[in-house]
């Protein structure tokens, strides 16, 4: 077993130990013909199994549109998790917005999410 295979297996174990199924929604932006962008209709990406991890403290992030938000949750997924900044998902009665995605190291995907107002 290679080191990469070992780490991928460990990521799978962490997720399977405390799985959460979330349904991400994504709004694609397109050229509006006037030099700007227009939001399309939300696309449901379907259920995806991840591990949700609470955040200690109140880390803050700036969103691409300039908002400062407090990160409430981390989302741990497999390397092929279909998740992007701006995606939203409901969890335990709250709506969350993905504000950061990292695919490094290559054996996992980690995202940060903020409660969406």
Segments from the language model and where they lie:
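Short, conserved turn/kink motifs that form compact alpha/beta structural patches or helix kinks used as
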Residues: 1-6, 16-117
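N-terminal low-complexity, intrinsically disordered "leader/linker" segments enriched in small/polar
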Residues: 11-14
